[in-house]
Amino acid sequence: MASLLCCGPKLAACGIVLSAWGVIMLIMLGIFFNVHSAVLIEDVPFTEKDFENGPQNIYNLYEQVSYNCFIAAGLYLLLGGFSFCQVRLNKRKEYMVR
């Protein structure tokens, strides 16, 4: 029978910690981009043409970056779930007798 175990216990625990931090950080960044934080203007991919029609184009770019942050947070959440499954499989492996 094929085993789904592909990570050791330390790597799985590290994956959980990094995923938790990534989810928290990216959700906060997504919220800050969604409220159009002026501090994050350097991270918005705008051109000179975007400044011609008022702030609405810049606001749309802020929201696009915000959605990208939320999507990345979702991917980190999936990675954290995978790492959690690996931790559970490693614990189950400890109790199995060969």
Swiss-Prot record:
Function text: Endoribonuclease which preferentially cleaves ApU and ApG phosphodiester bonds. Hydrolyzes UpU bonds at a lower rate. Regulates the activity of vacuolar (H+)-ATPase (V-ATPase) which is responsible for acidifying and maintaining the pH of intracellular compartments. Required at an early stage of receptor-mediated endocytosis.
A GO cellular component entry from the record: vacuolar proton-transporting V-type ATPase, V0 domain
Keywords for this protein: Cytoplasmic vesicle, Endocytosis, Endonuclease, Hydrogen ion transport, Hydrolase, Ion transport, Membrane, Nuclease, Transmembrane, Transmembrane helix, Transport
Taxonomic lineage: Eukaryota, Metazoa, Chordata, Craniata, Vertebrata
Principal subcellular localization: membrane
Enzyme Commission identifier(s): 3.1.-.-
Annotated transmembrane regions: 13-33, 65-85
UniProt feature coiled coil, ranges: none
Assembly and interaction partners: Interacts with the proton translocation complex V0 of the V-ATPase. Interacts with ATP6AP1.
Family according to the record: Belongs to the RNase K family.
Localization, UniProt: Endomembrane system; Cytoplasmic vesicle, Clathrin-coated vesicle membrane
Superkingdom field: Eukaryota
Entry keyword annotation includes Lyase: no
GO molecular function term, any single one: RNA endonuclease activity
Native organism: Mus musculus
Protein name as annotated: Ribonuclease kappa
UniProt record, GO biological process: endosomal lumen acidification; proton transmembrane transport; receptor-mediated endocytosis; receptor-mediated endocytosis of virus by host cell
Membrane-protein topology: Multi-pass membrane protein
Record flagged with keyword Plastid: no
InterPro entries assigned: Ribonucl_Kappa, RNase_K
